[in-house]
C-alpha cells in the first residue's frame, strides 16, 4: 500500500502503487509527467466499474479494478489492483501487471480469489496483431499484497467445492453440482490437494469436508 495514503470513500479515488510509484486517482484518473521536466504525460485510469468482494477474509467488502497506464510511448499496460475496506473507506494496494495491449474481459472475486479473464497474443505474434488467445490469471492476498499465484489456459477453469479425504475415499463435490466426483490418478496436483487438506485439517476426523477452490481442467 502507498505510504501515507488514507482511506477514501471510493476505490476510484484511492492511491495505488504502480511500478513502485504512488498514483493518486481522482474520479478514476491521474495524469503526471512521465519523467521530471518531460513534456510527455503518464496517464492512468480505471477501466470499467470496480468489482466487489472480500479479498482479505475480514468480512468487509473490498474492491478490485483494472488500471490502464499509458506512459506516452507505444505500450498500453493493464494492471489489476485491490482497494481494501478499512475504517469505512478504501485503501489502495499494489497494482499487478497483467499485460501490454491485452483485451480485458472479466474481473471477479471467488472465495477471496481474484479471477482475471482476458485475451492476449499467441507467442511470436506481433504486438500489432489483435489479441485472440483466451487466458485467465488468478491472484490472492499474500503478505498483505495482491499476488499472482497462477494462470489458466483455454479450457481450464476455477471451481469451488467440498473436498473430502479419508482412509479409502478422496472426493470433490462442486458447489454448483451436488454430485461428488472421485479424486483419482497420479497427477502432482492431487498430491497438492491432499497436502493442503491435511494442512488445513490437522486434527479433524477423516471424511470431514473442507471447502476448497481448485483450478485446472477435467
Regions of interest found by a model, annotated:
Residues 45-55, 103-115:
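Beta-propeller blade termini
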Residues 72-81, 124-130:
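Structural motif
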Residues 1-26, 105-158:
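Acidic, small-residue rich beta-repeat scaffolds with periodic aromatic anchors
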Residues 1-55, 60, 64, 74-76, ...:
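Flexible low-complexity loop/turn motifs enriched in small/helix-breaking residues
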Residues 191-215:
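Short nucleic-acid-contacting surface segments enriched for D/E, G, S/T with interspersed K/R
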Residues 155-170, 213-218:
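Structural detector for short beta-strands of small beta-barrel domains
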Residues 57-67, 112-117:
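Acidic/hydrophobic-patterned starts of short beta strands in beta-sheet-rich repeat architectures
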Residues 170-190:
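OB-fold (S1/OB) nucleic-acid-binding surfaces
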